[in-house]
Amino acid sequence: DEDTSSGDYPNNYHFYLPRLCNHCTKPASLEACPVRAIYKRDQDGIVLVDQDKCQGFRLCNRACPYDKVYYNYVKRKSQKCIFCFPRVEAGVAPACARQCPGRLRFVGYLEDADGPIAKLVYQWKVALPLHPEFGTEPNVYYVPPMLPASFDAEGRFSDEPRVPTEYLRYLFGPGVDQALITLDAEMDRKKAGKPSELMDLLIAKDWKSLFNITDVQITSGSGAATS
């Protein structure tokens, strides 16, 4: 399928929203499995499906509100993103994050105050979970899109956002309003030649700054963010 946009020219818009398993703190798929084939690892919070235990009932597929558990009709097992846990165990970022040419994906632990995830989620509050109203406490966070300025009927720049804020609230909840204000203010600081820790973090000139997953002991959950 070809990409399509929303809105009317010249203010039409589209953006990409990478989707992966959220490795939720309260995964609905885990609760739905009658044979306890789905489990959450204590050491990093990654949610996995035990392929030996899975009986292919597919209750987990229907339970996940993000539709991120699929059924393998060949193996007759439910499967999902494993967050590349063998790589994480070796201190290497998941393949989707490490190979991203746009340097858009950050990987780290929420409990690591010096890591990128904690700064984006807690310090700057610009990284938000998708559909927080589902109540599963997802551990993948998104920095909302900041698109070019829109135009008014006379073809002049308008203060109206190109992506309707109402739509972003639908995706990321009410916290997106303040996140957009913060992002806009920090972008203006950077344009004016002033320092901005947030913009430097998101620009990620050093790719290693995207990842901070080694030598961290946690018990609740890992986190990922995409900008």
Set out the residue ranges of the language-model regions.
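Short strand-loop junctions, especially beta-strand C-caps/beta-turns
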Residues: 52, 84-86
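Extracytoplasmic Gram-positive cell-surface binding/anchoring modules and repeats
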Residues: 22-24
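Long, compositionally biased charged/polar accessory segments in the mid-to-C-terminal portions
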Residues: 95-227
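Membrane-embedded catalytic interface detector for glycan/lipid assembly enzymes
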Residues: 79-82
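Iron-sulfur cluster-binding cysteine motifs and their immediate structural context
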Residues: 1, 26-53, 58-76, 92-114, ...
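Short Fe-S-cluster ligation motifs
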Residues: 1-20, 58-69, 87-95, 123-147
